[in-house]
Amino acid sequence: MGKAKGIRILITLECTECRSNTNKRSNGVSRYTTQKNRRNNPERIELKKYCPHCNKSTIHKEIK
């Protein structure tokens, strides 16, 4: 018997402005790791988080 998959999974959130914007404070892309409940939030998450590269709060989207 195999072990059942957990309901909570680890996800990565990436800044949407760092990908397209070249005028930023430093090079790189801001990424956060967090957990989400697969049953309550089956779609991809978008959260407003602080980006140290853009030096402001931006929308971070879930990536694979």
Curated annotation (Swiss-Prot):
Give me the Gene Ontology terms describing cellular component. Answer: chloroplast; ribonucleoprotein complex; ribosome
**InterPro entries attached to this UniProt entry:** Ribosomal_bL33, Ribosomal_bL33_CS, Ribosomal_bL33_sf, Ribosomal_zn-bd
**PROSITE patterns the UniProt entry points to:** RIBOSOMAL_L33 (PS00582)
Taxonomically, the superkingdom here is Eukaryota
GO BP of this protein: translation
PANTHER family linked to this entry: 50S RIBOSOMAL PROTEIN L33, CHLOROPLASTIC, LARGE RIBOSOMAL SUBUNIT PROTEIN BL33C
Name recorded for this polypeptide? Large ribosomal subunit protein bL33c
Q: Which organism is it from?
A: Trieres chinensis
